[in-house]
């Protein structure tokens, strides 16, 4: 993102990164597919004795890790496109379309998953490669960027090192929060503490740990990542905080949904039911991602974000008390409505807030809201679910869903902190 802000290519600032990132993605997918050729490799003995894994798994891991780097090259470029080429009064609609297109891979996964069951791995890889190539060509050939005529000055300090330090801070704060949650569970003797008190205390510590790690991680991370400009970009920092609150909640709710269906509803086919739930969320998300973007241009971003948080909270509340499949699907509908509205309105607000000349750097920082969402929601929620499930089977999932509902509400309550809604 920082490098794309200063790119003077004739293609513009963003398209070179989108193009090369997508092409490198294809190379990495070939590495992933190539792992199949190492299944009976004579190198297995070396890899197993040295690293404890087979040669095939080592190549697979290498391809996946490299794919994280190359895909983020493309993502860094595409994130800066909307603030670069879309007028402010149309960014809600553009963000809605962006959210819609980002959901298509979820449908693609549902379509190609049966091919994996049939062991048609290379067909799956070629399909993914075709999508990377097709969407890259569509973007590069259809987008009209105005190239920079001269390279902007370098950001003060060492921005790459600042970004690395930002990541270390975020992970460290999250691990500290996890330690506090585990400690609160140990401080309450199981034989003398009532169950409701343990749920209340550990649950409250968990919510404070999640919300606190998000706030502290983003706040201090932004000081490091943005530098001296952070003092004048408080609205942007609060935007990242609210974004991470919501993404941590919805991502973790989705991740634990199958275990809830399996252990609480005790259905014989939890994977199938979870697929149906994902489809319901996807359908309602599609509806509101476009509509929400349009409405945010007309009504304002924060009003739509408040509605999104309330809808998602209702979805988690319904999920907690769901004991039938139809009720789970109704909960999924509310989660989809809230998520679609949030994704379009929130990104539109973010593109309004970032400085145009540094859009790549700022929106790159917001990537931590996506990556950090999984760290916060799952690393704290997972051990909490295990703790309560050990006390009473199935209890852990309603408890952590309640915490995720709390994050949805906190994301709404913090919206007034975003006092500036545009750089203009």
Set out the residue ranges of the language-model regions.
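Loop-to-transmembrane helix entry/capping segments in MFS-fold secondary transporters
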Residues: 57, 88-97, 271-272, 354-367
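Cytoplasmic membrane-interface "Motif A"-like loop-to-helix N-cap segments
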Residues: 6-23, 298-309
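C-terminal transmembrane helical hairpin of 12-TM major facilitator-type secondary transporters
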Residues: 296, 302-345
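Short amphipathic helix-loop junctions that connect adjacent transmembrane helices
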Residues: 182-196, 255-272
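Intracellular loop-helix junctions on the cytosolic face of multi-pass helical membrane proteins
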Residues: 50-63, 74, 78-79, 85-251, ...
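C-terminal ends and interior cores of transmembrane alpha-helices
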Residues: 19-53, 310-323
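Intracellular juxtamembrane helix-capping segments at the cytosolic ends
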Residues: 73-86, 341-355
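Helix-to-loop junctions at the C-terminal end of transmembrane segments
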Residues: 1-11, 117, 288-300, 385
């Amino acid at each position: 993102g920082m490098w794309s802000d200063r790119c003077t290519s004739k293609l513009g600032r963003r398209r070179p990164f989108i193009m090369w990132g997508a092409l490198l993605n294809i190379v990495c997918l070939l590495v992933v597919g190539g792992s199949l050729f190492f299944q009976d490799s004579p190198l297995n003995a070396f890899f197993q004795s040295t690293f404890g894994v087979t040669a095939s798994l080592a190549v697979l891991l290498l391809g996946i890790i490299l794919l994280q780097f190359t895909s983020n090259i493309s993502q860094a470029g595409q994130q800066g496109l909307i603030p670069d080429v879309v007028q402010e009064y149309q960014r809600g609609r553009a963000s809605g379309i962006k959210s819609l297109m980002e959901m298509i891979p979820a449908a693609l996964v549902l379509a190609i998953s049966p091919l994996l069951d049939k062991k048609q791995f290379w067909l799956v890889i070629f399909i993914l490669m075709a999508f990377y190539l097709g969407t890259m060509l569509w973007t590069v050939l259809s987008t009209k960027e105005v190239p920079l005529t001269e390279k902007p000055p370098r950001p003060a300090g060492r921005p790459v090192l600042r970004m690395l330090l930002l990541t270390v801070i975020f992970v460290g704060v999250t691990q500290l929060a996890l330690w506090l949650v585990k400690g609160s569970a140990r401080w309450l003797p199981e034989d003398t503490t009532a169950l409701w008190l343990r749920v209340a205390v550990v649950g409250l510590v968990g919510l404070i740990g999640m919300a606190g790690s998000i706030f502290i991680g983003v706040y201090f991370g932004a000081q490091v990542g943005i530098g001296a400009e952070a003092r004048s970009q408080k609205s942007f920092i609060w935007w990242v905080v609210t974004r991470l609150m919501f993404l941590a909640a919805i991502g973790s709710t989705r991740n634990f949904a199958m275990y809830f269906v399996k252990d609480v509803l005790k259905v014989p086919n939890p994977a199938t039911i979870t697929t149906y739930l994902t489809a319901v969320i996807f359908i309602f998300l599609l509806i509101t991602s476009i509509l929400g973007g349009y409405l945010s241009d007309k009504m304002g971003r924060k009003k739509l974000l408040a509605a999104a948080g309330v809808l998602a909270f209702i979805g988690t509340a319904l999920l907690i008390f769901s004991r039938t499949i139809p009720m789970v699907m109704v909960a999924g509908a509310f989660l989809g409505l809230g998520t679609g509205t949030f994704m379009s309105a929130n990104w539109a607000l973010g593109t309004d807030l970032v400085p145009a000349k540094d859009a790549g750097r700022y929106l790159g920082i917001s990537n931590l809201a996506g990556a950090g969402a999984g760290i916060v929601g799952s690393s704290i929620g997972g051990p909490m679910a295990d703790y309560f499930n050990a006390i009473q089977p199935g209890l852990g999932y309603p408890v952590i869903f309640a915490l995720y509902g709390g994050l949805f509400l906190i994301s709404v309550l913090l919206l007034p902190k975003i006092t500036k809604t545009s750089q203009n």
